[in-house]
């Protein structure tokens, strides 16, 4: 049986902002990482998982991406990134990029266009709904507090944001969204990266109709059961594998809150052709009571 390199690799996450500052501006950067590659290699690290370095207004530490194919100025340039990849491969180390495609920044060009009008060609790249009786479309709460819906007066509708109001959710039911995401992934893979860590990837498929959570509680409540491991999640990940991932010798891991060990097998079984691994959080709650 042929060995798969990712099963035997030691992976180290680098949060670039706090890792190593090469120019004394108080912010870690790509050149700082390059300067420590020999040290990281000596520690026995095979793969670096690089937290987001894409262009971003930085509302959520880079997880609000305004351009997937540019590097945030604070971290350096694309030339610096190219040098990092080259120097890593020279040391027989591999680079895994963070893939954040449940949502973008509200400063991404897709969203800027989307909010201009209801008939804009990018409108359905995001999840827009009219209000109900002067309120939000449903009672879902956002991970960062408050409603998961933000009213936008330009078109008198609300957009869904499961996280920050500056992180509108992409509409994965729109095939054009999926194809644009796949093209972006190919951009980085053709540059030579060795894998993706996929941020909250099991949130991308929402239940049809976006139903409200049935509860006696007032205010905003978790809508997880209506978007976590949603109805088309396996269809979309299989499609991603078929169109992109299977064409490269890479490592893939999905961050998946709320996935049980049995459900994890559905995402990672080789015969299912989706992902190779998941971050599974069930064990984190073993000593938690009803209130957390």
Task: Cite the ranges covered by each PLM segment.
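Hydrophobic residues within beta-strands of alpha/beta enzymes
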Residues: 48, 196-198
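Noncatalytic carbohydrate-binding groove/subsite architecture in carbohydrate-active enzymes
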Residues: 256-292
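Acidic/aromatic-lined carbohydrate-recognition and catalytic surfaces
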Residues: 2-186, 190, 203-260
């Amino acid at each position: 049986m042929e060995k798969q390199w990712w099963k035997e690799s030691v992976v180290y996450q680098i949060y670039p902002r706090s890792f190593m500052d090469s120019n004394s501006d108080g912010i870690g950067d790509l050149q700082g990482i390059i300067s420590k590659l020999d040290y990281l290699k000596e520690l026995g690290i095979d793969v670096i998982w690089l937290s987001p370095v894409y262009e971003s207004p930085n509302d959520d530490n880079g997880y609000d991406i305004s351009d997937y194919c540019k590097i945030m100025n604070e971290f350096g340039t694309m030339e610096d990134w190219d040098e990092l990849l080259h120097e890593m491969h020279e040391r027989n180390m591999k680079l895994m990029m963070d893939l954040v495609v449940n949502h973008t920044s509200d400063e991404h060009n897709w969203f800027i266009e989307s909010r201009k009008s209801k008939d804009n060609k990018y409108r359905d790249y995001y999840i827009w709904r009219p209000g109900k009786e002067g309120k939000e479309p449903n009672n879902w709460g956002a991970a960062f507090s408050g409603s998961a819906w933000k009213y936008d007066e330009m078109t008198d509708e609300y957009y869904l944001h499961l996280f920050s109001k500056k992180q509108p959710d992409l509409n994965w039911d729109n095939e054009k969204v999926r194809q644009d995401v796949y093209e972006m992934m190919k951009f980085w893979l053709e540059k030579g990266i060795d894998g993706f860590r996929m941020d909250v990837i099991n949130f991308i498929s929402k239940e049809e109709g976006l139903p409200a959570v049935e509860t006696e509680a007032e205010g905003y409540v978790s809508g997880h059961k209506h978007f976590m491991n949603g109805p088309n999640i396996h269809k979309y990940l299989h499609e991603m594998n078929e169109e992109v991932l299977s064409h490269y010798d890479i490592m893939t891991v999905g961050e998946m809150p709320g996935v049980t060990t049995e459900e994890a097998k559905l995402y990672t079984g080789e015969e299912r052709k989706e992902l190779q691994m998941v971050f599974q959080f069930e064990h984190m709650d073993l000593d938690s009571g009803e209130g957390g």
